[in-house]
Amino acid sequence: MKTKRSLILYLFFFFVSFLNGQSQTAFQHLKENVGNILAFNKYLPQEKVYLHFDNTGYFKGETIWFKAYVVRTDKSCLSDLSHVLYVELVTPGGDVIDTKKFCIKDGEADGYLKLDDKVLESGFYEVRAYTRYMTNWDNECIFSRVFPIFKKPNKEGDYSKRVIAEHSYVQRLPDYRESADTLKVKVKKINARFYPEGGNLVQGLTSTVAFDICDEDGAHLAADVYVIKGTDTITRSKTEYQGRGLLRYTPDGEACRILVTDSSGHHREFSLPESLQSGYVMTVNTQNPKSVLMHVNSSPDLYGKGVCWVVTHNGITESADTATMGADGTIRQFMRDQLEPGVNQITLMDDEGHVVADRLFFNYPHDQSDTINIASSTALSPCKKVSLDMKSLSHTSFSLSIRDVETETNGYNQDIRTWLLLTSDLKGFIENPEYYLGEDDALHRHAADLLMLVQGWRRYDMTMMTGGKKFVKREPLEDALYIDGRLHQVKKKNPVSQVSLSATLYNAQGYTMTGNGVTDANGYYAMKLPDCEDEWTMLMYTKKNNELTKYNIGIDRHFSPQRRHINYAETQITPIDKSNLFFRSGDEASDSSVFVPMDKRNHVLKEVKVKGHHIFENARAGWENERNGAYRSSMYYNCADAADEIADKGEDMPEIHDWLSKRNPFFE
């Protein structure tokens, strides 16, 4: 339906451009670019993953349960592309300590992660989810969620004491995560980032510049911002929602200073991005509840030049047109009811088809068909049943998790609606995303616009989608479960081409599977497996000319994305005053008058107190026990997985000390 709509718009604007007599060169590039966008989405559609969890924080020893939804963005529906979902548990330092695969059926999957002995210390752990196909794009494309994992309570059931370890370099723990945003200019007390609207400052043209002010930990700051040239203040502004704000600035080629002063009196100076002598400036007004207004101006040397623009949502063309630049620029209005809800993107291109400016804006959704209502009751009491009335679209499924609001841990309140409509199209962590979808009024529209300007990462790269930049597809789309990789020579006399492989898999229940394959001219192979669950052991054999021949068999399974930087707001704990765990006494009346046999009812047993602990008869055996050692450790290295990765790459196996020194510089 969306493709048909795009084609109709395409033909419509063809005749509009022709009748208006606008630049035929710009129109020709518009025609080519819209066609390239359609082709890109047809052959390389993107996916989004959302995980719905049962809680907002966990204790060591518990289990993280989740329901996964995989969405195809070009059709805004559950995906029919990928069949395998990867879910990872990542330590605060960025080590992936657990990776599981789950079968995606009709765009959905479900599963769990056990917080067992692999979780050595409490801390803020990250759960990531992605399909292999998604790793062809930036690591910002994948799903990511940070959870506090607390120490196991000393008294079972007492969750009021939540103890969590702080990540400290005094403990000589390495950090494999990305550093903070490279665009951020870090100083002692104040960090400031500046974003010209549309992407560039142009001399002689007034631009809107968004800014984001925070402290060295990433916490938002209230501050005043001054633009100073020489000894004169030419403009000033101040922060608004969450340390963000706007200023209007007209560069003239002379250097200016930016002075930022916070509420405590601390101040620092910064520089704005360099201005261009020639170019375009885009200004977008989103405050009208009915429409979005775009105004494009250019430097005088570009008067008479043709430009074209494309409005897209999820990479799909919604509107397109051309214009000829003049002294007054060009203005276009886009009606909100003709645009899709969520994050939309305006891309401006010159008469040669190059992207010269772009801008994100948010369109508030008004269609809310999913509702959950709690039946009215005189009072809510512990262990009392509550009736829920739920409404959703027909022929759909949904998941539901219920928890005590007073036991919320890190204040995380995002749902699938905020993820799909907002945060999955933006860069980094979005604090309180539900705020932007709360009301469609001037205050919320302005806050959402500030968010678009400072965290507007481009999930859909229009330079790439229009053919201006090459897309490299490194990983395949897994429409089934595959084993693929490459053979590496052990002896040079044995070529890796046309080698027969046979694989045998077996599990603890005694089931077996077998498969065969042949390598290509470069030694690559792939074998398709039927769906299977739990752990399986695989044995692989290689034959050359029907004789067993030794090769190093590499498996392509190391495509885990780069670990991102964890935002300050993701590691904040909501205080809890008291425990909210209740037990029904044995003689308390049931809420239901329906007779339930004794063996079908739940029974509250008396608390059992442990008076003694087992003492090892052989102390050395206890000391050498791996599980006992892991319990007292601060770092965990899965040497077996590391050895597999080295073998898969065809590299020589290093000595343990050399490997540790490379893995962790503190071992040097």
Description of each model-found segment:
Residues 1-32, 390:
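Bacterial Sec-dependent N-terminal signal peptides
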Residues 26-47, 52, 58-59, 63-103, ...:
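Contiguous segments within soluble domain cores/interaction surfaces
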Residues 40-44, 55, 59, 80, ...:
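Surface-exposed, low-complexity/disordered segments
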Residues 44-48, 88-99, 229-232, 313-318, ...:
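Short beta-strand and strand-turn-strand segments in soluble, beta-rich domains
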Residues 67-68, 88, 125-133, 347:
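Internal, hydrophobic beta-strand segments that form the core of beta-sheet-rich folds
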Residues 111-115:
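Ligand-binding face of N-terminal immunoglobulin V-set domains in extracellular IgSF glycoproteins
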Residues 225-227:
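Short, surface-exposed beta-strand/strand-loop-strand elements in extracellular ectodomains
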